[in-house]
Amino acid sequence: MELNTLKSTFINNFGKEPTSLFFSPGRINLIGEHIDYNGGFVFPCPITLGTFAAASLREDRICRAYSLNFESLGVIEFSLDDLSYKKEDNWTNYLKGVLKVLIEKGYKIDKGIDLVINGNLPNGAGLSSSASLEMLIVKILDTFFSLNISKVDAALIGKEVENTYIGVNSGIMDQFAISLGEKDKAILLDCNSLYYEYVPLNLGDNSIIIMNTNKRRELADSKYNERRKECDDSLDTLKKYTNISSLCELTSLEFETYKDKIEDSNKLRRCVHAISENERVKDAVKALKENNLELFGQLMNQSHISLRDDYEVTGKELDTLAENAWKQPGVLGARMTGAGFGGCAIAIVNNAHVDEFIKNVGQAYKDAIGYEASFYVASIGNGPTEL
């Protein structure tokens, strides 16, 4: 049991029982990929895999932190008086980053904490282990220091840590999906305005299967920033002809009028993906509300094809998973999720076919790629909570 391991590790390292236990989920995005930074709608939900913590407040200004995921690093110690980024401090830079941003915003944090964490999200798999950790830390500090941070502000704080302290140019989706997570609901989020709406995820006799390629992807040094630049360049071109502030403000029909202004064929395809994907999100949410799971699944498939052909962020591993998933009985739809270039895909599969699905897709993947994929049946959980 994870919580017992967490407690005993805390006692072994710090010589006392932790006062509190916490959990923060990871996330999957059901549809709406690579458009959070293009002003589009996304449709993520929190999952029951995530990051657990045991924590206690200290009486001095020292923080001590230990991760069961990085045991070789041992206990990492630092003071509230020096919260500068240090590469050797590894994962605890997320703790330091959250502390630094909160203190700079005027929140009163005058004591250190002892912390042990243990995550069961596969690292680098695109299930937002870093956002899960950020939202976990905000929750712990909010609880210990009675900071009254709203869920939306918590997400914005996490994004600020990611962008300004860690140095990853990510959007708001991951932190938002986790911070505002509610059981059995997905969140339709407009990344421009932060308008959001909860949509019950009624999947009937079907489950969401997460398929991990086990090919690590690193957001910062993948082609993520290259795609962002291609979209930003295209937007700059289009702004000369139409009054928009983001690509996803255009419909496919409107884009037809202006598409010849974008001379680079790669950039043109990136625009086609962003604009069509935004429309797919709206159609998918409508389908879900009308209980049309078949259409929802078809839109997932179309999303993957667009990410493969127009946005070019899938790669052999993700394509092997998705394309083999489409052939299986009982499958409504399948697509990559997250930034791509490795990481995970998801499928919606009829419960009666889940075992067969995992066996067949797993075998096809191993035959094609040479190593195994991992499969998880996902449940949609709550946002960060004290246990």
From Swiss-Prot:
Residues flagged as site, Transition state stabilizer: 27
Binding site for ATP: 67, 124-130
One Gene Ontology term of the molecular function aspect: galactokinase activity
Subcellular compartments: Cytoplasm
Domain of life: Bacteria
Residues that coordinate or bind Mg(2+): 130, 162
Gene3D superfamilies tied to this protein: 3.30.230.10, GHMP kinase, C-terminal domain (3.30.70.890)
Claim: Kinase is one of the keywords in the record: yes
GO biological process, one term: galactose metabolic process
Top EC category: transferase
EC number: 2.7.1.6
Gene Ontology cellular-component annotations: cytosol
Annotated keywords: ATP-binding, Carbohydrate metabolism, Cytoplasm, Galactose metabolism, Kinase, Magnesium, Metal-binding, Nucleotide-binding, Transferase
Residues engaged in binding substrate: 33-36, 224
The keyword Repeat appears for this protein: no
Enzymatic reactions: alpha-D-galactose + ATP = alpha-D-galactose 1-phosphate + ADP + H(+)
Sequence similarity: Belongs to the GHMP kinase family. GalK subfamily.
Protein name: Galactokinase
Protein's organism: Clostridium perfringens (strain ATCC 13124 / DSM 756 / JCM 1290 / NCIMB 6125 / NCTC 8237 / Type A)
